[in-house]
Every structure is written in C-alpha cells, then in structure tokens.
Amino acid sequence: MATRNSSSPKPMGTAQGDPGEAGTLPGPDAGIRDTSSATQLKMKPKKVRKIKALITDLGSQYCKCGYAGEPRPTYFISSTVGKRYSEAADSGDTRKETYVGHELLNMEAPLKLINPLKYGIVVDWDCIQSIWEYIFHTAMKILPEEHAVLVSDPPLSPTSNREKYAELLFETFGIPAMHVTSQSLLSIYSYGKTSGLVVESGHGVSHVVPISEGDVLPGLTSRADYAGGDLTNYLLQLLNEAGHKFTDDHLHIIEHIKKKCCYSALKPEEELSLCLEDLRVDYELPDGKLISIGQERFQCAEMLFKPTLVGSNQPGLPELTAACLNRCQEAGFKEEMAANVLLCGGCTMLDGFPERFQRELSLLCPGDSPAVAAAPERKTSVWTGGSILASLQAFQQLWVSKEEFEERGSAAIYSKC
C-alpha cells in the first residue's frame, strides 16, 4: 500500500490569472494583491501580524527567494559558496572568509567553491547558513526575527533535514515562525492542482513524484541522479569533440550556450539528416570571437532520454516516468496520474523538450494516453507554489512558531510539516 506524506491544506481549483501580471498570483487564490493580513499566524498573532512571509526554494544551482503573494521570486542567488583557502589567511588578515551571491564577483583572494547540495540534498550546513545570512541581510535586507519563513524540502530527503532547518532558522536567526514542506507538493500547487504526476528536473537531480489529493506518495517516487548540470557538462564535451577548447572554468559560458542555442529534437534521427548549414548557429563569446554550433545543439539534450551517453545506467526521464506510472497502477492511481503529468524545473525549459517528452512517454504507455502539461513559468514552480500556499488562510494554522519549537522540539515540526 502506498504511503502518504502531507500535512498542508489542499488548494482547490485550476490556475487563474497571468503569472506575468504584476501583483497577481496564479493558482487557487488568484487575484491576491496584499498578503499582509493573509500571513498572520493564528497561533501567535501579536508576533507576526502585518508581515509578509519569506518563501525560499534552495536548489542545486540557485536559491529563489521572495515574499508570499508575489507572482515570481525577487532574487535568484547562486547556491555556490566561496571559502578562502586556509593557507591564504593569516591572523592579521581582515578580508572576508566566506563569499555568497554577487560577492563571488568581487572576491579578494583565491576561493574554494563549494556547492552545499548534492543531488538536491544538503551536505554542508555551514554553507547553507552563509546563504541564509546573505538572503536576510544582503539580498532581501530584512530582519529575520520579523518574518515567517517557508522552506521547500526535496523528495526522498532525510527527515532530519526538517529538524536542521528549524534549528538553524529558529536558533541562529530567531525567526518567529516557519514551515517546511515538500518541493513536489509546492510544484503541483503552482499548476492549481492537488493530484498529478510531478516530473521535476532541475540542475542537480530529477524526480518523478505521484501526488493524490494533496498527499505525496514517497513509496512510489522515482529519482535519477542527472539533470541540467549534467546536460551542460555533456554539451561542453560535445563542443570540445567538435574542436573547441573549453574547460570547467567556462561552464558559465556553456550554460548560456545551452539556454540560447540548444533544443530537444522531436525526432533526432531526422535532425541528423539535415544539412549542417541548416543547423548551424553562430555564438559570440565574451571576447568577441564567433563560434559555430551545429548538431551539438540537439545532441546534448539526448542524454535526458539516453543517460548512457554520459555513462549512467539509469533510465531516461520518460522511462523513469513510465515505470512510476506502472507502480501507480498497482496502487490504484495510474489513470489519475497519467491524465496529469506535470513538467517542473529549469531543465524542462529546453526548447522542444515538452513535445519530445510527450512523444516518448506516449510510445512507452500507448494504452494510457498520458497528458503532459508544461506551464510557461515551470522553472520556478516550487517557489510559486510556496507563494500560493503561504497566502491561503487555511494554511496559517500550520506555521510552527518559535515558542512551539522551544517547547516541543522536533515534535512541533512533524505535527505540522
């Protein structure tokens, strides 16, 4: 029997409004323009009245942050943290030890670059603390003790993650209230739905997560340890095989090439038969040099369908999804899931990917008529879902206050998150 995992309220209805309309929120509570009253805590109204909750989505590439009720994040902050090498510092050195966000562009000494997440899971909590300090004091310029915070939690993460987030935010930053909830649940809320199969592929990891009536089903969830970062590395490899000389120091350039020039071919075998002149595009490097990019434009995306191209024996994303659908059949959810396959995450933003994914999944599940949806703003689906959720009146009772955490410890987290 599939296990369920959810304590969040279930917003009903379909998405309304235009995500690009300033001050308008898509989703079940479309039209919310001022969340100053919507984010009051019923438990401790005197401490968090007239404030906006801070919504955060910490991903492998970027941390998205902004206020509840807004249609999109205020800031995208790099999840990479720079630490000075110990041998580069001495007792009289007054320069910074840790660099986050735009500080990495103005570093005063050689830095060791650290990504505190591996496959979406936090592995370095000291760096996470540095990112939070940057969010509160440099990016948002707010006093943390005046704002409730909603944090997203990736699928299949250790349950101890939620406790660690609570300890960090309550004890180090003194926030008045917080809530941690499933990344996939927030993604489905961004679609204005409570049931569906969430196919998430960001920078560091991909997941296929079934959700039924607002309940996450972790026992049926699938994970693949490849995503957008691997696609970027594969593009670098392909470009070098074509005669270019890029290194890991140029990954930011390769990332830009991927976003501007690359696409997912509906039928790659037909693309291979095209004249190279029809495929080639010129790309101007930062130094002004022009390079031509041909078949690499669509070849790089093939690793999402054939991970063996990058040395992985894991199934491609459509196969991973089809296998998850088959497990849902045993649990009695297959028809519901197949009718609502929802693409989320930055890696799915590649031109042509939704159409190719739909085609491959339909070939794998011919009798299920899978319906794939791809929202225009799906790159920030987790954050948008958090913005919706924290604005719902029904959600306000699920904030965990600092006083509750001090009195009950982790039990307060697990009873509401």
Swiss-Prot record:
Kindly give the InterPro entries that the UniProt entry links to this protein: Actin, ATPase_NBD
UniProt keywords, alphabetically: Cytoplasm, Cytoskeleton, Phosphoprotein
Residues modified to Phosphoserine: 8
CDD domains per record: ASKHA_NBD_ACTL7
Places the protein is found: Cytoplasm, Cytoskeleton
Q: Where is this region: Disordered?
A: 1-42
What are its GO cellular component terms?
A: cytoplasm; cytoskeleton; nucleus
Chief localization class?
A: cytoplasm
* A Pfam cross-reference name: Actin
Identification of the protein by name: Actin-like protein 7B
The record's similarity note reads: Belongs to the actin family.
